[in-house]
Regions:
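Cyclic nucleotide-binding regulatory module and flanking cytosolic helices
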Residues: 1-46, 90, 95-97
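Short loop/turn motifs at secondary-structure junctions and domain boundaries
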Residues: 33-34, 51-54, 178
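Short aromatic/basic micro-patch
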Residues: 41, 84, 115, 187, ...
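Cyclic nucleotide-binding regulatory domains
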Residues: 48-110
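Alpha-helix/helix-capping structural signal
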Residues: 65, 119-120, 191, 230
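Cyclic-nucleotide recognition modules
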Residues: 83-148
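Polybasic "coupling" helices that flank or enter modular domains
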Residues: 126-198
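Phosphate-/nucleic-acid-contacting segments
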Residues: 171-251
Length: 251
């Protein structure tokens, strides 16, 4: 079900502004231009795809509420999750130039997302050339996150791998006002965490138990509580540089 706090008097595309403000500066004129983009909201239930691998896309999806996963399905139904997207993320911005999807975007939770036509985005960037840099920067940050996930899955041990993911997801949400005081939504299952980290769900369960034992985190009722941020960062060897956030958020 939708979070009642979503229904405010704010313009529909405010989450996108929050996301872009977290990684760059925007002029008032450019912000107003973004808010005027045509956007068509749609609701997705958990497990439903916003767009599937092989689809030819004519629009970008902006997450307004809920969690979306980027994933690929392999033979035998095996799944690899390569990103979690939250409110403010334009999860498939590269489709503006690469319209045939090489992955799928699926709803992890109840999701409200807005489709923004490619043509409208192209027109925005032509009329407001200063906005090319913020959107390009957003794409580059997305690529940096993907590189970090490759390192996470490929080289970090399980304990460090999961700790690193929790650090990232907390800061991503804090940057757009969805988390504070080292507490944030974490509406994923142990199977989701396994598919995002390349571990088994049994290994995830054991690693979560170890993180709790060490009094670093607690995860229950779809909420992550970080008991000791400094020690969690140390355990993960987490360097937030790749997120390119305001430094006060990463402290």
């Amino acid at each position: 079900m939708p979070d009642p706090s979503f229904f405010t008097d704010e313009p529909q595309l405010t989450p996108l502004l929050r996301k872009l403000r977290s990684i760059t500066r925007l002029s008032a004129r450019d912000e107003q231009a973004i808010l005027r983009l045509p956007a068509h909201p749609r609701v997705f239930t958990a497990g439903q795809d916003l767009v599937s691998e092989g689809d030819r896309s004519t629009q970008c999806w902006l997450v307004l509420m809920g969690w979306v996963q980027r994933y690929k399905l392999l033979s035998g139904g095996r799944r690899q999750i390569s990103a979690f997207h939250v409110a403010g993320d334009m999860a498939d911005l590269p489709s503006l130039h690469l319209p045939v999807m090489d992955h799928s975007l699926g709803a992890v939770t109840y999701v409200m997302a807005a489709s923004i036509p490619h043509e409208a985005l192209r027109e925005l960037l032509e009329r407001h050339p200063d906005l090319n840099a913020p959107f390009w920067r957003d794409t580059l940050v997305d690529a940096a996150i993907f590189r970090e996930w490759v390192a996470n899955v490929g080289r970090r041990p399980a304990y460090q791998r999961l700790a690193h993911l929790f650090c990232e997801l907390y800061l991503k949400q804090a940057a757009v006002g969805l988390a504070q005081d080292h507490r944030c939504p974490m509406p994923v299952t142990q199977v989701d965490l396994a598919d995002a980290t390349g571990l088994t769900s049994v290994h995830i369960n054991r690693t979560l138990r170890d993180l709790r034992r060490d009094k670093l985190i607690d995860l229950r009722s779809k909420t992550l509580v970080i008991h000791d941020w400094t020690r969690l960062v140390e355990a993960a060897e987490f360097d937030p540089t790749y997120l390119q956030l305001d430094r006060t958020l990463a402290a």
